[in-house]
């Protein structure tokens, strides 16, 4: 070979791409413009020394001497997750582990004497060496192909035996299901001959790993050049070791899963690699038998159809919990609710209907969750009342218009004087009494007649057996009388009409009967089924006849109840006593209520510490239809709540707490809805609406409910009554602080503030008002609300002048000669000029004269001259209207 070798020829000799060889020459400090340039032997040795230095070999050929030991520092970083206990929960923390190692290599010159310079080899010797290396490579390749053929035959034999065993097993089972047989990989049965051309890529991937031919080895000048190559695999070809690239290895692992996409193949292939990104040891160096998968291997498939979930939801649920049940992201759930017009966050609560709508919008189904175990246990308790029903006393509710004599009638029956001691002479809460008469025991409920106590009257009609409608003979049918008839009809209870005050000279019982005909209440004498009794609570006339009518009606109804077992009933009224705590007036409807019983009453529970009747006695037990006061509850229950006696306090507490949680969730849903309604309502209104904040405390729950409803009803477009807090009992320090914060007016209905509350109220100037009559509360709140409305500017016409003639003045211009036809015209008041009853100008007077004298006012039927300021178009027949603006206080 000639001494001159081009770069292209050298690249073919060392089996390296021309571009890469040019890069290596450039890295060694030699610049070449093209692959056809000549490379000398010196430049070849310089390139060889550069490659050795690059890969850490001693450059003895160049004669370089290492003065200092070589150091190499390896920095390694690893990311891992550590689970940390944080209280009751666990938190995952990302931790970065950093490792640094330094390796020091001592120069070979310290252990060996300097070697002699290498002998320069000619091109002929170099070609001989390359030829021997090529022959060695061909021998190794032939050996590898022979071993690969042996491995292939062994694998095919194993596959054939396995298929025969599976076929025999399937025949034994005689199943009718279709069987997908695994087809072994077909390969050339001929012996592998020396490869003359590379195997196609598709065929290579289809072969098992042990059968694949190794890629052609590149010829190299020496072993060090083999190490200097950029291949990712650095090992000695020995025995049956097969070099498999990462791409071929990934294809081998999933060669049988034909349904996988290329992206899934890449993803699954990447999952088998180690943390450092390299493949596992031995996966690419040894033909492992276990790693060879059959062509029939099956993988996981992603569902093609939409997944429809069916979840159970109670009355309320938070947005985050609903998203978790539906396996959705909370953000997607909030977005879907926003599209439906519901603005919520992930922590807010939505009701069952909203959950159903949004779930159907997202393609899922929602069912109503079953009742809780506690409620089921409570229901089982109520159904365990056994015994023979026996007759019980009737429960009679006295209803009617205010001041028609309901309480006076009950006083006469009970031989008491309750009406005299009531504030304002009107009843403001339900009174429950039982009276022993010659005709048996009768329980009476006295309801208020004021319009504000509608819900209280409806509650009385719900738990009663008979309604006695009291109508004054001198007043006739009034609005609350009609309302009482509607309540009785809605509750489905019989009605007895008591026409009271017949001792008055203006009494007209016949008028009452005729007016009630319009309400479909027909007396017996008119062919109806309603009993009418005329009486006087003052003289006692007709009271016995009323008791007889009640007894007859009770016998017709055949009222019965079980008097033994656990008691159940209804709360009539409740209050907070300073010395006794929460006090509830209850009416027993089934069973027997005894001292020491555990009972659940709405969201409250407790043990009966004491029982009191209406006169203050402490009975040992209360039978059906007997009202009593109960002490020992955990809080003040709402009027109208049902109570149930249970076995132990644990069950009572669990049921009460669960009910409180449900009520709180419902309240949150309602408040969220109210906030939305407030926002939408305020969008259409200006900022002129005033707000009056109120804090109401009352003696009993029924009065509190009536007060809140009556005061909130006073709101209109100009002012809104906002009740920030209501409660039963005295005004406490926390109530005073709430009033200071919200700038609210405190209303105490039959209650007073304690010393600490009074101190805060006086220090901050809070408006505190005490009341005992509901009329006064409503009137005072109306006055306060009217004061917030401010004043209204109104225009009042005080005089009209008719223009009879027009004069010209050098000083004032056009002057109108007028006759006052109505009222009085004043100089200081504004005026309007009307032409054909249409306003053409509005301004003020510049001059008002009578007989050439300036005057302040001119009265009716008097002539005068009027000069209108900045207006000269006054005509005969116009009217000049004089008016004044006055301020008028606004009222509700």
Swiss-Prot record:
Disulfide bonds: none annotated. The keyword GTP-binding applies. It is found in: Cytoplasm. GO terms for molecular function: GTP binding; GTPase activity; guanosine tetraphosphate binding; translation initiation factor activity. InterPro entries: DNA-bd_dom_put_sf, EF-G-like_DII, EFTu-like_2, IF2_assoc_dom_bac, IF2_II, IF2_N, P-loop_NTPase, Small_GTP-bd. SUPFAM superfamilies: Initiation factor IF2/eIF5b, domain 3, P-loop containing nucleoside triphosphate hydrolases, Putative DNA-binding domain, Translation proteins. The keyword GTP-binding applies. PROSITE patterns: G_TR_2, IF2. GTP binds at residues 400-407, 446-450, 500-503. Residues 165-175 have a biased composition (Basic and acidic residues). Residues 208-222 have a biased composition (Low complexity). Keywords: Cytoplasm, GTP-binding, Initiation factor, Nucleotide-binding, Protein biosynthesis. One of the essential components for the initiation of protein synthesis. Protects formylmethionyl-tRNA from spontaneous hydrolysis and promotes its binding to the 30S ribosomal subunits. Also involved in the hydrolysis of GTP during the formation of the 70S ribosomal complex. This is Translation initiation factor IF-2. It comes from Xylella fastidiosa (strain 9a5c). The gene is infB.
